[in-house]
Design a protein with these regions (language model features):
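Phosphate- and other anionic-substrate recognition elements at nucleic-acid/protein interfaces
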Residues: 3, 8-137
């Protein structure tokens, strides 16, 4: 499972059982640290997730985004509640790529804003899966 944490929402994506492709699952509206962690942990349990991929926002220069000050405490709260393996994944340009993907899939423009984070999470997860595949060969 992958999460794309923003200031107002958290995009969630899952992989198929073979861990080859990622798909958007849902977008959670941010409600506070403990509430967000509880919602994400519920999804971890529901989908029997062993590894959580967390989008790591960086500027094109490579410098860390200030949003990390919100993401780190959330990840620590999840880690405190569940013994899930955490992996960080560079998410540069994921939102722009998500917009392109939604346009390709003909997602209506009025729905794109609501679905952007979950599509970005799916891209983050797909990038992680591809990196893992490359490391195996």
């Amino acid at each position: 499972m992958a999460i794309d944490v923003g200031s107002k929402s958290v995009g969630i994506a899952l992989t198929d059982p073979m861990k080859m492709t990622a798909r958007p699952l849902t977008t959670l509206t941010r409600a506070g640290l403990k509430e967000d962690a509880e919602s994400i942990c519920g999804l971890l349990d529901e989908h029997r997730v062993e590894r959580l991929i967390v989008g790591e926002p960086r500027f094109l220069s490579g410098q860390e985004s200030p949003v990390m000050s919100v993401i780190r405490p959330l990840v620590e709260e999840i880690r405190r509640r569940r013994s899930v393996e955490i992996h960080w994944q560079d998410e540069r340009l994921s939102s722009k790529e998500a917009e392109k993907k939604m346009a390709e899939l003909k997602v209506p423009p009025e729905q794109r804003r609501k679905k952007r984070d979950e599509f970005a999470a799916a891209l983050i997860l797909q990038w992680h899966l591809e990196e893992q595949s490359e490391e195996q060969y």
